[in-house]
């Protein structure tokens, strides 16, 4: 089984678009899009990971 990952190297960003392309984090929380997810990854100091694409 391949690990799912997202490149968050260009984050954090000060503002995210409202585009809805959900990602499910390892905290079992659904993030609205890559920007929201990656900002949360940065805030968690890298402890948050991607569980899967789509809603949790």
UniProtKB/Swiss-Prot annotation:
Molecular functions per Gene Ontology: serine-type endopeptidase inhibitor activity
Primary localization class, coarse: secreted
Site positions per UniProt: Reactive bond 3: 18-19
Compartment(s) where it occurs, according to its Swiss-Prot or TrEMBL record: Secreted
Glycosylation sites: 45
GO CC annotation, single: extracellular space
Domain of life of the source: Eukaryota
InterPro entries listed in its UniProt record: Bifunctional_prot_inhibitor, Kazal_dom, Kazal_dom_sf, Prot_inh_Kazal-m
PANTHER family: OVOMUCOID-LIKE-RELATED, SERINE PEPTIDASE INHIBITOR, KAZAL TYPE 2, TANDEM DUPLICATE 1-RELATED
Name of the protein: Ovomucoid
Organism the protein comes from: Syrmaticus reevesii
